Amino acid sequence: MTDQAEKKHSAFWGVMVIAGTVIGGGMFALPVDLAGAWFFWGAFILIIAWFSMLHSGLLLLEANLNYPVGSSFNTITKDLIGNTWNIISGITVAFVLYILTYAYISANGAIISETISMNLGYHANPRIVGICTAIFVASVLWISSLAASRITSLFLGLKIISFVIVFGSFFFLVDYSILRDATSSTAGTSYFPYIFMALPVCLASFGFHGNIPSLIICYGKRKDKLIKSVVFGSLLALVIYLFWLYCTMGNIPRESFKAIISSGGNVDSLVKSFLGTKQHGIIEFCLLVFSNLAVASSFFGVTLGLFDYLADLFKIDNSHGGRFKTVLLTFLPPALLYLIFPNGFIYGIGGAGLCATIWAVIIPAVLAIKARKKFPNQMFTVWGGNLIPAIVILFGITVILCWFGNVFNVLPKFG
């Protein structure tokens, strides 16, 4: 990429790619998983997760900038920490991105078919809808990564508009007695123990790391634009998440979340609880628009990261023929899995959590430490010396322990 090509892309697109990837269908799980900790402790642990994931992303960017444009996890890990860690990293990256691609194909099929049914009265087969959605996204990626980035930006913009319309009205209807849990039968109990069960979900809510190599392809080594993209994209996501928690936990009583959790904690349960409080036609419509766009923008972001990762892994060129091969590698495995197991959104998101902790938290910190030794005059170094990588690694270990604590029912669960 020439300097002229790099300069013409505004940092705005990078911010939208990061935020569009992060702010997706998974955000509907946040108020459900944070119901035990409730608003104030939930906001606290969400900010901790954002701080840690932001810096793990910057550490990954730091290591990546020492290598040629287009280099991905495979190239960097093999050079800095050896083939064994490269294999571990490769397995976790591929698993997370593939399983998320599968999950979003599943979610798109379910949400779009439900929207068609509610508005047109026509029952569309979710499998057909999901596959058609995958074909559309694959076609865009085949054209160019920049086209995918711009569509993600468009979806994010529309998503924010629908979000503001829906929750702007609920913002002014927040009941502070509900937000403080003052009227609940559990009022006055300890909320702190429930933050640990929510940590893995909070981590997954800031999973933008697969898009960093794609940003470098777009911007080259313009570190100012890259840093702005990561910082402001993740910060935008944090602000929207906090606003989202404020509106949900200020309108839906904490006790009501027990019923949502018992019904599986799916998107439709939370939306129905919202509509049950103050239902309006325009609000219902915008909720449907928002839920569709939330999943669609994350779908584009995740597949863009997987596409670039596979192109680097198999050294496939950027020609139309090469991009077509990469598209097939990106979409065929998750599409086939979706045809066999069409309803795996929640299982897919949950299964990706542990691996995401390894490759999106621990490995970036290790890569940055190794890169500082190998490239003492590198162009970008995250502030704080070795303290920041240490904090990030500690956060990752804590999340892993909490994940296993959830699996083996060691941690307290709400509902």
UniProtKB/Swiss-Prot annotation:
Q: Where in the cell is it found?
A: Cell inner membrane
Q: What UniProt keywords are attached to this protein's entry?
A: Amino-acid transport, Cell inner membrane, Cell membrane, Membrane, Transmembrane, Transmembrane helix, Transport, Tryptophan catabolism
**Gene3D superfamilies the UniProt entry points to:** Amino acid/polyamine transporter I
Q: Which gene encodes it?
A: tnaB
Q: Give the chief site where it resides.
A: membrane
Give GO terms for biological process.
amino acid transmembrane transport; L-tryptophan catabolic process
Provide GO CC annotations from the record. plasma membrane
What's the name of the protein?
Answer: Low affinity tryptophan permease
Q: Give membrane topology per the record.
A: Multi-pass membrane protein
Q: Which family does it belong to?
A: Belongs to the amino acid/polyamine transporter 2 family. Mtr/TnaB/TyrP permease subfamily.
- Identify the species of origin: Escherichia coli O157:H7
What is the role of this chain?
Answer: Involved in tryptophan transport across the cytoplasmic membrane. Plays a role in transporting tryptophan which is to be used catabolically.
Which of the residues are on side Periplasmic? Answer: 33, 108-127, 175-191, 251-286, 348, 409-415
TM spans (from-to): 12-32, 34-54, 87-107, 128-148, 154-174, 192-212, 230-250, 287-307, 327-347, 349-369, 388-408
Q: Name one GO molecular function term.
A: aromatic amino acid transmembrane transporter activity
